């Protein structure tokens, strides 16, 4: 008798087996220079977010739970080595802490904050090169992105957090390559990860902080699933298309077209968008259009009578994006397109400080005067492009408008600048330069785990401050 977890369901090849075989067999040297460069930029961007978010409550809470162990994995910006699952959890929460993490629009998921913490935590336990770590991450992004494209709809994303749904598969496949599992073991890890899909979007309606912990749950679960598979645990191969598998359970429909990784040699990581500001992905292009409008309005926002925002249906439908207040927490403001646009118009800038002005009377006046609509053309172009148009009617009856066909991503120089500032504030300028140099040449590194050690506080023995007893 053969258990399904160790073979195919009913004697037929499953979608999971085909996907896992492709993920595990992708050659380390099979990715183009452009793909590798994008992966390194995403890695640096992730680290910049993790360093900058260290003082925030959710980052501190996650770090406080990390259990010190000998020869463990390191937390970004801390000194103590911890259990790999604890490190993955804390580093994922910190990477998500600013709401500036990278974004894959087609899956509506933040893949970097589940993939990189898993890869870096495991790279300290299992000896892999930088090239192997980069390839593992690229495969992880690809896995999450392709599954996400197949399953995520605006209706599903209204209830479930896409990062929590597809992230476990992404992190498990990235980690399987670092750990060195064989295909059957990786398939079992993949199936186990399917049982860790979770994350509800109620936080977007309340502003509560559970959102920040979603990637942490994913990364920690992925490490656990990999350990279980390595020890012989089995899982359902039909986890994707089965009667009670991922697609029927969450999408309420069967799996359609088979999911293929790297079709025609294209890598999904190249479709990842690096945010210029710490706010919801869907608020980025409307705020950028609003900034162009603000620069054309003489005398400031007090001359504005009304605001009209046109963008994609996905943006309008995503939980929290159409919120008009009241805003009790900055997270609610970061999710709200009307708030983001109003704050940009009122302050003439897109900045983190905008989202601290929850009681600003002028921002509130503009939010109340705002109409948010889905535009058919922008909707048709999504997710390849994320367009937006902002039209303001002035009190004198004239109008000012600006439109973007697509969001403007943070560029290489911006990502490097904010990494340097954040890392240097924690570790000093010399250490920050060493980290950046290692990331730049990561494909030549003989020990990928050295990067995680570089990101830790050198020589520190004190564990993260604990606020919750064990």
What is each stretch, according to the model?
Residues 112-120, 167-174, 219-224, 283-285, ...:
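Well-ordered alpha-helical segments within folded domains of soluble proteins
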Residues 143-169, 215:
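Aromatic-lined, polymer-binding surfaces characteristic
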Residues 94-149:
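Hydrophobic alpha-helical hairpins/lids featuring a short glycine-rich hinge
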Residues 1-108, 205, 210-220, 227-470:
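Terminal-appendage/accessory-domain detector
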Residues 11, 15-19, 61, 131-140, ...:
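Extended, well-ordered alpha-helical scaffold segments
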Residues 53, 119-126, 172-178, 225-229, ...:
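Well-ordered alpha-helical scaffold segments within catalytic/enzyme domains
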Residues 125-137, 180-187, 235-238, 298:
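Structural helix-adjacent loops and short alpha-helical linkers that scaffold large soluble proteins
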Residues 192-200:
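Flexible glycine/proline-rich, aromatic-decorated loop/lid segments
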């Amino acid at each position: 008798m053969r258990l399904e977890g160790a073979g195919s369901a009913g004697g037929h090849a499953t979608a999971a087996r085909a996907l896992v075989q492709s993920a595990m067999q992708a050659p380390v040297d099979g990715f183009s220079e452009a793909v590798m460069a994008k992966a390194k930029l995403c890695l640096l961007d992730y680290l910049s977010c993790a360093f900058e978010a260290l003082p925030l409550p959710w980052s501190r809470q996650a770090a406080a739970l990390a259990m010190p162990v000998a020869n463990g994995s390191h937390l970004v910006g801390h000194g103590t080595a911890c259990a790999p699952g604890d490190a993955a959890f804390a580093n994922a929460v910190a990477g998500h802490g600013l709401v500036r993490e990278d974004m894959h629009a087609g899956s509506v998921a933040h893949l970097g904050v589940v993939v990189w913490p898993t890869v870096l935590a495991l790279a300290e336990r299992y000896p892999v090169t930088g090239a192997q770590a980069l390839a593992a991450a690229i495969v992880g992004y690809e896995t999450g992105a392709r599954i996400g494209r197949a399953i995520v709809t605006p209706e599903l994303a209204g209830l479930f957090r896409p990062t929590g749904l597809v992230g476990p598969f992404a992190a498990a496949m990235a980690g399987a390559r670092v750990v060195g599992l064989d295909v059957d073991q990786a398939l079992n890890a993949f199936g186990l990860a399917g049982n860790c899909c979770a994350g509800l979007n109620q936080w977007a309606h309340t502003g509560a902080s559970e959102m920040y912990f979603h990637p942490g749950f994913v990364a920690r679960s992925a490490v656990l699933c990999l350990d279980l598979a390595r020890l012989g645990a089995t899982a359902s191969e039909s986890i994707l298309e089965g009667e009670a598998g991922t697609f029927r359970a969450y999408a309420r429909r069967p799996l359609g077209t088979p999911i293929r990784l790297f079709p025609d040699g294209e890598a999904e990581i190249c479709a990842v968008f690096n945010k210029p500001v710490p706010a919801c992905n869907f608020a980025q292009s409307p705020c950028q259009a609003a900034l162009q409008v603000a620069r054309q309005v003489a005398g400031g926002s007090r001359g504005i009578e009304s605001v009209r925002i046109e963008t994609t249906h996905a943006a309008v439908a995503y939980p929290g994006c159409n919120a008009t207040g009241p805003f009790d927490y900055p997270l609610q403001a970061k999710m709200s397109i009307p708030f983001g646009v109003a704050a940009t118009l009122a302050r003439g800038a897109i900045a983190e400080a905008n989202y601290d002005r929850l009681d600003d009377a002028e921002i509130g006046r503009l939010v109340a005067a705002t109409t948010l609509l889905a535009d058919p053309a922008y909707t048709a172009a999504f997710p390849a492009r994320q367009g937006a148009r902002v039209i303001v009617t002035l009190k004198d009856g004239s109008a000012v408008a600006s439109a973007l066909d697509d969001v403007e991503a943070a560029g290489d120089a911006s990502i490097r600048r904010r990494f340097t500032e954040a890392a240097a504030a924690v570790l000093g300028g010399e250490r920050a330069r060493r980290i950046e140099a290692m990331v730049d040449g990561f494909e030549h590194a003989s020990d990928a785990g050295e990067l995680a050690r570089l990101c830790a506080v050198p020589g520190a023995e004190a564990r993260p401050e604990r606020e919750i007893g064990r």
